[in-house]
Amino acid sequence: ADEEVEIVQRRVESLGRALQLPAEKPPLEEIRRVVTIFRELRSGVTADGKMKIKTPSSTLSTAEAISVINQGLSLAAHFGDGRMRASDVASGLVGAVVKDPVQDRVAWLEYLATVMKERSGWKDLYRSCREVTQ
């Protein structure tokens, strides 16, 4: 779990330097949340193993997690105050998960309602994802 988070963090930081993004380093917590969401949706079960969830058709690879975080950093740098927040990550997250507008949307909405909404400290990400999923 933490190995994937570290890979995403390292790649995002090196890409940010290469692109000279005028943004702060992405908060580790945002990277951790994206990696957790991808992992849970890939495996069809929550991290604690307590709940089975529908899996979308998308691959949700580590490379896609890097892309979602990079997109969030770019939004924060160019349209925000340089600090990446949940709202900066939400559209990339939804775009990565929902490839098929019917099947994937059902899996995503179920994940939002049953997992993300109930998770402690994830209300900001839940709200942002709900907004862009409409």
Label the predicted regions.
Residues 1-52, 78-82, 120-130:
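Conserved C-terminal "switch" segment of AAA+ ATPases
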Residues 2-7, 25-33, 55-67, 71, ...:
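Charged, alpha-helix-enriched surfaces in structured cytosolic catalytic cores
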Residues 40-47, 62, 66-84, 95-101:
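AAA+ ATPase "lid" subdomain C-terminal helix
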Residues 77-134:
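C-terminal engagement/docking regions of AAA+ P-loop ATPases
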